Swiss-Prot record:
PANTHER family: RNA BINDING PROTEIN. The modification Omega-N-methylarginine is found at residues 471, 486, 506, 572, 596, 607, 615. One of its GO terms (biological process) is regulation of DNA-templated transcription. This is RNA-binding protein EWS. Binds POLR2C, SF1, calmodulin and RNA. Interacts with PTK2B/FAK2 and TDRD3. Binds calmodulin in the presence, but not in the absence, of calcium ion. Forms a complex with REC8, PRDM9, SYCP3 and SYCP1; complex formation is dependent of phosphorylated form of REC8 and requires PRDM9 bound to hotspot DNA; EWSR1 joins PRDM9 with the chromosomal axis through REC8. Ubiquitous. A motif (Nuclear localization signal) lies at residues 639-656.
C-alpha cells in the first residue's frame, strides 16, 4: 500500500499539483508524514536511530522503502495532524511558495512563515530572521516539549531556513533545498519537539513535497536531494558534513545528523552557522570554508570539507563552504562561497586579502624603538596568544627588520602566531598600545610588507609570472581561492615569514635585499648592475648582459627555499592550501605537499606545475575533490625547478 500510495503520491500528488496535493497528499502525505514522522520520530527517540531510519528511508525512499515505511507508519502515524497541515504546506511548498508552506503548516507556520520569507527571499538575512521567527513559532508548535520546542524552533527555524535555503538551493541545484529541509526537518524537528512528529512530519513532507517537486518522486528529489546532500552536505558540510557523506549513506549520516539534531541546540547553531554558511555555502559551497567554524569538527569534517565550512565551512572552517570540500567551502566550491563563517577560509577576496585575512597568522608591527629585542617582543606579544616557534631554531617566529647600514632595528617587525584568529585578535589588541615608550601600529602582515624583508614573495619577484599577491608572500597567499577558494589560504604559510628562518637561499636578503633568491637565480656579472635574475632568464633583466656560462639552476631548490610559495590559485598554496596546514591533504592539495612546493617550480613559470605537492612529502591524501590535485604530486617533488613543461603540461587539461 505504501508503495502504491507513494507512487500515487509521487505521480498523482506530486503531479496533480500541490493543490491536489493538499487533498491527496494530505492523506497520502499524512501517512507519509506520519510514517515519516513516526519513523523518524520513533527512531528519533533514538536520534541515531531516527536518523538512521530516516536515512535508510531516504535511501530506500527513492524506492518503496519510503513508501513502505511510510505506508506503515501512516497507519500508526495517521493521527498526526501535522501531516495534514503539512500536506497543505507541502502543497504550498509544491506551489513553490515556501511562504505558502509556511503559512500552511500549522506548527511550523510561524517558522515557516519566516521561512517563507526565507524561501522567497533566499536571502541569508532572512535566514537570520528566520531563526527568530522560528524560535518563537516553534515553541508554539512544540507546546509539548517546551524546551524541545524551543530548540526545535531554533532548529526548526534553522532547519526550515535550511529549507528555505534549500529552496534557494533548491532552485539552485539540486536538492540542497530539499536537503536541508529534510535533514532539518526530520532531525531537527524531531529532536526539538518530542512531538515534532507533526513538524517533522510536516517537515518531512515538506521535504518530501520538495522531493516530489523535486525529483518528483522517482528521483525522489529527496533522495536526490540526499544525494545532493552530499553536495549539499558538502555545502553545508558544516552542519551536515557528516550528513553529506552519510547522507549518501543516509543512515549513518542521518544518525549523525540526528545526533546533531539531537543536539538541537548545537544543531541549530550548527545549522545556523551552516546556514550562514549555507548561504554562503550554498552560494558557493564555500562551506567548507568557514565550515570550520560552523560545526566544528562536523563542519570541518566535511568542510573543510565541505571544505569545512561546509557548511565545510569551517567551510567549519567551514564553511564553508561547498565545492570541494564541502562543496563547500568552495565553489561549488567557491562559487558562491561566500565567506564562511570563518571568513578567512572563504575569504577569497583579493589575492592578498585572502591570505591576510583568512590565513594570515602574522602581524606587522611598526613604531618600535631601535633597542627592541626579540625577547622583548616575544614577551609582549605573547599576551594575546601563542607566538609561533621556529622548530629548527627554537626561537619565536618574530622578525625584527634591521637597518642595513646601522644594523639596528628599523622600528618594524613581524610576529607570527599559531593561527590566524590569534593574529587578528593581536592586531585589535596591540594596535595603538604603548610599548617601551612608543605607540605601536599593528596590522596583519601583508604579503608585501612595507619593508623589503626576506619575506617570501615580498617583492614582486621580478616578474615571476604571477601577480605578487599570489606570490607566496608571507605565507603565500595561496592565491585567492583559486578554484577552490579556500584553498588559497594558508598557502604560504610556510613560505612565508622569514621568521621561519632563513629559508634556504630564498629567504635571505642577500644580494637583492628585497628580492628573494631561488635556487638557480643568478647575479648579473656586470659590476655596475649586479641584478639578481631568475634562473630562466638568459640575459640580465636590467642591463641585458648575457647570463654567465655554467650558471645552471640546481636540480632541487635549496631545502628551505620556496617553501611556501603559495601558488596562485589556492591550489598551490603553501601548505596545502585548503587545510590550514596542509594537513591531511588539504582540500585539495596534497596537504603538506603544498607546503613545500608551492609554487616552486616553475621558476618563472609561475605555474610551474604543481610544485606543490611535489615537494612535499606525501602529498597527503587527495582532497575530496581534488583527486588529481591532491595527492597528485607528493612525494619528493621533482626538481624544484619543476620541469617546467612537464607537470605544467600535465595539468593543463585539469586546471583544478
Amino acid at each position: 500500500m505504501a508503495s502504491t500510495d507513494y507512487s500515487t503520491y509521487s505521480q498523482a500528488a506530486a503531479q496533480q499539483g500541490y493543490s491536489a496535493y493538499t487533498a491527496q497528499p494530505t492523506q497520502g502525505y499524512a501517512q507519509t508524514t506520519q510514517a515519516y514522522g513516526q519513523q523518524s520520530y520513533g527512531t528519533y527517540g533514538q536520534p541515531t536511530d531516527v536518523s538512521y531510519t530516516q536515512a535508510q528511508t531516504t535511501a530506500t525512499y527513492g524506492q518503496t522503502a519510503y513508501a513502505t515505511s511510510y505506508g506503515q507508519p501512516p497507519t500508526g502515524y495517521t493521527t498526526p495532524t501535522a501531516p495534514q497541515a503539512y500536506s497543505q504546506p507541502v502543497q504550498g511548498y509544491g506551489t513553490g511558495a515556501y511562504d505558502t508552506t509556511t503559512a500552511t503548516v500549522t506548527t511550523t507556520q510561524a517558522s515557516y512563515a519566516a521561512q517563507s520569507a526565507y524561501g522567497t527571499q533566499p536571502a541569508y538575512p532572512a535566514y537570520g530572521q528566520q531563526p527568530a521567527a522560528t524560535a518563537p513559532t516553534r515553541p508554539q508548535d512544540g507546546n509539548k516539549p517546551t524546551e524541545t520546542s524551543q530548540p526545535q524552533s531554533s532548529t526548526g527555524g534553522y532547519n526550515q531556513p535550511s529549507l528555505g535555503y534549500g529552496q534557494s538551493n533548491y532552485s539552485y541545484p539540486q536538492v540542497p533545498g530539499s536537503y536541508p529541509m529534510q535533514p532539518v526537518t526530520a532531525p531537527p524537528s524531531y529532536p526539538p519537539t518530542s512531538y515534532s512528529s507533526t513538524q517533522p512530519t510536516s517537515y518531512d513532507q515538506s521535504s518530501y513535497s520538495q522531493q516530489n517537486t523535486y525529483g518528483q518522486p522517482s528521483s525522489y528529489g529527496q533522495q536526490s536531494s540526499y544525494g545532493q546532500q552530499s553536495s549539499y552536505g558538502q555545502q553545508p558540510p558544516t552542519s551536515y558534513p557528516p550528513q553529506t557523506g552519510s547522507y549518501s549513506q543516509a543512515p549513518s549520516q542521518y544518525s549523525q545528523q540526528s545526533s546533531s539534531y539531537g543536539q538541537q541546540s548545537s544543531f541549530r547553531q550548527d545549522h545556523p552557522s551552516s546556514m550562514g554558511v549555507y548561504g554562503q555555502e550554498s552560494g558557493g559551497f564555500s562551506g567548507p570554508g568557514e565550515n570550520r567554524s560552523m560545526s566544528g569538527p562536523d563542519n570541518r569534517g566535511r568542510g573543510r570539507g565541505g571544505f569545512d565550512r561546509g557548511g565545510m565551512s569551517r567551510g567549519g572552517r567551514g564553511g564553508g563552504r561547498g565545492g570541494m570540500g564541502s562543496a563547500g567551502e568552495r565553489g561549488g566550491f567557491n562559487k558562491p562561497g561566500g565567506p564562511m563563517d570563518e571568513g578567512p577560509d572563504l575569504d577569497l577576496g583579493p589575492p592578498v586579502d585572502p591570505d591576510e585575512d583568512s590565513d594570515n597568522s602574522a602581524i606587522y608591527v611598526q613604531g618600535l624603538n631601535d633597542s627592541v629585542t626579540l625577547d622583548d617582543l616575544a614577551d609582549f606579544f605573547k599576551q594575546c596568544g601563542v607566538v609561533k616557534m621556529n622548530k629548527r631554531t627554537g626561537q619565536p617566529m618574530i622578525h625584527i627588520y634591521l637597518d642595513k647600514e646601522t644594523g639596528k632595528p628599523k622600528g618594524d617587525a613581524t610576529v607570527s602566531y599559531e593561527d590566524p584568529p590569534t593574529a587578528k585578535a593581536a592586531v585589535e589588541w596591540f594596535d595603538g598600545k604603548d610599548f617601551q615608550g612608543s605607540k605601536l601600529k599593528v596590522s596583519l602582515a601583508r604579503k608585501k610588507p612595507p619593508m623589503n624583508s626576506m619575506r617570501g614573495g615580498l617583492p614582486p619577484r621580478e616578474g615571476r609570472g604571477m601577480p605578487p599577491p599570489l606570490r607566496g608572500g608571507p605565507g603565500g597567499p595561496g592565491g585567492p581561492g583559486g578554484p577552490m577558494g579556500r584553498m588559497g589560504g594558508r598557502g604560504g604559510d610556510r613560505g612565508g615569514f622569514p621568521p621561519r628562518g632563513p629559508r634556504g637561499s630564498r629567504g635571505n636578503p642577500s644580494g637583492g635585499g628585497n628580492v628573494q633568491h631561488r635556487a638557480g637565480d643568478w647575479q648579473c656579472p656586470n659590476p655596475g648592475c649586479g641584478n639578481q635574475n631568475f634562473a630562466w632568464r638568459t640575459e640580465c633583466n636590467q642591463c641585458k648582459a648575457p647570463k654567465p656560462e655554467g650558471f645552471l639552476p640546481p636540480p632541487f631548490p635549496p631545502p628551505g627555499g620556496d617553501r611556501g610559495r603559495g601558488g596562485p590559485g589556492g591550489m598551490r598554496g603553501g601548505r596545502g592550501g585548503l587545510m590550514d596546514r596542509g594537513g591531511p591533504g588539504g582540500m585539495f592539495r596534497g596537504g603538506r605537499g603544498g607546503d613545500r612546493g608551492g609554487f616552486r617550480g616553475g621558476r618563472g613559470m609561475d605555474r610551474g606545475g604543481f610544485g606543490g605537492g611535489r615537494r612535499g612529502g606525501p602529498g597527503g591524501p587527495p582532497g575530496p575533490l581534488m583527486e588529481q590535485m591532491g595527492g597528485r604530486r607528493g612525494g619528493r617533488g621533482g626538481p624544484g625547478k619543476m620541469d617546467k613543461g612537464e607537470h605544467r603540461q600535465e595539468r593543463r587539461d585539469r586546471p583544478y
